[in-house]
Amino acid sequence: EEIYDTFCDTRNIGWSKLHDYASFLEDQNDYTKAIEVAENLRWYYSVPDSKVDEYYLGRLYNLLGMLYKAQNKPDKAEKYYLTAIEICEHLVEKNADAYEPALATSYNNAGVFYKEQGQSGKAEKYYLAAIEIMKRLVKKNADAFEPALAASYNNAGAFYYKQGQSDKAEKYYLAAIEIRKRLVEKNADAYESDLAMSYNNAGVFYKKQGQSDKAEKYYLDAIEIRERLVEKNADAYEPDLAGSYNNAGIFYHEHGQLEKAEKYYLAAIEIYERLVEKNADAYEPNLTAVYNNAGTFYYGQNKPDKAEKYYLAAIEIQKRLVEKNADAYEPYLAMSYSAAGVFYDNQGKPKKAEKYYLAAIEIYERLVKKNVDAHEPALATSYYNAGSFYSEHGQSDKAEEYYLDAIGIYERLVEKNADAYEPALATSYLRYYFLKKDKTYLDKVYEIAKRRQDDPRCRYIVEIVEFM
C-alpha cells in the first residue's frame, strides 16, 4: 500500500521519468539500485488502473532484461527480453511504422544476450531480424535510422567474429564503419565516439586474421579519435581510451614491439587506476584485465617480480568482486587463477601452480553446471593446462584424466563450430599422443592439422608430425 501511494504521488511528474532514472543508474553501473527502481515501476505498471501504454511496458521489460544480464542473471534477463519482443511484435501488428524501431531494438538486445550465453543459433536469428528491419527503415528515413543500422552491423560483426566466420564478420564491421564515417562528416560531435568503437573492433578483427598492417591502422585510428575526445570530455571518454590503449598494448606485445607494448599497457593502467579511485565498482574489472596483461608481458620479459605483482593484484581485486557478485565475476577470477597457474608452473613452483590450476577448474566446473555453452570452452582449456602440468611432473594417470576431459569437450565443441575449435582439439590430441603413444591420436591430429593450414597452431603441428 505504501509503495502504491508513493507511485500515485509521482504520477504527476510522469512514470517515464522514473524509467529515465533507472536508465541513468544503469549508465552509472549502479545495477542494484536501477533494478530496484525498475521493478517498482513494473509493479506500478501492473496496477489495474495504471493505464500504461504497451510501448512503455515493452521499454521497461527491455531495460530489465539489460539490467539482469549485467547482473549475470540469465533466466530473468531472458524472460524480460522475450516479453519485450512479444509486446513489440504485437504493437507492430497494429502500427508497423510507429513500432518497428522498438521491435528492432528488442531483437538486437536479444541477439546480444544469446551471443553472451553461447546460444549462437538464437543470437544469429535475432541479429539478422534486427538488421532486416533497420535496412527497411533506412530506406524510408536514413538520417533517423542509419545510426541504429550501424550499431546492428557492428553487433553482427562481433557475433560472426566470435563464431569464426571471418568473411561475414569483416563484411558487417566494414559496413558499420562506412555508415559511421558518413555520419561523422555530418556531425562529428555526435558520431566520432561510435566510429572509434568500430575502428577498435576492426583492429581486433584484423589482428586475429593476421593482417597486422590493417589491425595497427585501425587501432591507431581509434586512439587518435579517443585522445581528441578526452581533451574535450575526459570523464566521458577516458574509459574508452584506456580500452584502446590496452588493445594496442596487446597488439604490440604480440608483434614483439616491446617498448610500445609497455607504453600502452602502463598508459591503460594509469587511467584505470585513476578511474577506480572515482568508481571502483565500474572500473575494477577493467583494471584487473590490464593487470593480467601486464603480468603476462613482464613474465615474457623475464621480470618475474613485476609479473607476479600484477597477477596477484588482479586476483586480489577479483576475489573481492566475487564476494559482491559471484555470478558476474567468477569467470574472470577463474581466468586469473589459470594465468597464475601457468606463471608459477613456468617459474618452477609446482605447488603454487597446482593450487591455481585446480582453483580455476573448480570454478569452471561450477559455472558449466549453470551455463554449459558459455563456459565449456574455458573449462576445456583448464583441463588441458592441468593435463600438461601433471604430464610434465610425471603424474601420468592424472595427466591422462585431464587430457581426456579436455578432448571430450573439444570434440563436442567441434560438432557445433569446427572452425573455432578444431585447432584446440588437434593440440589436445597431440599432447595425449605424446603421453600414451597411441597412434590413433596421431592420425587424428594429422588429419585435422593438414586440413586446417589456415591456423598457425595446425601449421606447426604438421611440421612436428612430418618431422617425426
Feature-to-residue mapping (PLM):
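Leucine-rich, hydrophobic repeat-scaffold detector
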Residues: 1-92, 97-98, 103-109, 115-118, ...
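Flexible helix-coil transition and linker loops at the boundaries of alpha-helical arrays
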Residues: 2-13, 43-56, 89-100, 135-146, ...
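Terminal, low-structured helical/coil segments at or just beyond the last alpha-helical repeat
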Residues: 444-468
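Periodic short-repeat tracts
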Residues: 106, 112, 120, 124, ...
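Conserved alpha-helical positions within TPR/SEL1-like repeat arrays
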Residues: 16-27, 55-70, 85, 101-115, ...
